[in-house]
Amino acid sequence: MSEHRYLPDTRPYPAEPVKRELLMHAEQAARGGAQGKLAAEALRAQIYGMLSQNFYLNLSVALSMTPSETAYGTMMAALNDVLQAKTDEEIQWFALPVILVAGCKQAAALTAAAPAPELSACLANYPHTRALSRATWLPQLFTAGQISEINAGQWFKAKQNAEAAAEFAASLPQNDSLPLVEGQSVSAAFALGYGGRELTATLGKNLQEAALPLMQVWQQALSAPGVTLFANPLSPDSPPAALTDAGHMRLRMALDVFTANSIRSIRLQSPRVGVVMASQEGGRLVFGFNATDSQFELQPQTFTWPLSPMDKIEIVQQNFLDLLAECQVENIRLLHDPIGENDELPTYSQAVKLPGHNPLYGDGRHS
């Protein structure tokens, strides 16, 4: 495989390996095999010990020092396992995300009331989601920002028993509405709930045939005058995992919308669309759209994807290329070298003179 097949990873990993026991377990667990299984068990035990002793800060520091996306994913998998209900007394928390693509001519708001009865009734119809219909649902929806402010230590305390769960639920912020900016926007909202250990088996599974009915529940519950809305339901999962999945899907759908709009506007004035893909220092991917010929160039249209610690660049890149293929765009330039943190992305006519290749016709091996 060519080193230039995928966009380079510019996330700021530590320059030197950090010799922390937690990180060493994570790296070994990521490698798999018999030793990897032992390391994964040790990793879970250590995270459990940290959270039991209220040492969340140590875990947070270790997560910030992970040397790779793979190691970070291994640590998060261990954390999500620790946050699961393990006994009949413990509580299983879950989040049910929905991605909202909205359009409005002026700033607006959606209701933040969770459609709990409708969600429960819908999920009760399918064996793989039925247990969620017996859960306790919180009466309101939460934003991604609000979910991200809850740390693993708080989730760990809230799972100890029913009393702790109810106390935690009562302490969460109250929302009257979910604000929308003027124009098009893509955001995530979350329904939260909790129940017994039986819920664990429902988490992280594909919605399958429940997806369309669930979408209809969200559409009806969140519709508002003057707002064009499309709701994309995601699978229920533990709150940290749901936050990660929703963050990725929100950006993916935002990029889809931006791409379609950009291609449409360029084709109104130029016969050929040129697309530039690049990494940017500081952990970002940048996608630019313009005419292929400099004499037809328009105002640059650029989308920036800030990479989360668990984003897989190869997946982001392939999803984008699949979308371009659907839009019948063939003039693509993937730049081999990252652009500077404060540099503008070159236009297509500039990019073809820089080291790079068209990923539709090779992996950059001979470019």
Language-model features, listed with the residues they occupy:
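Charged, amphipathic alpha-helical stretches
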Residues: M1-M75
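Short cysteine-rich clusters marking metal-coordination/redox-active sites
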Residues: S349-H357
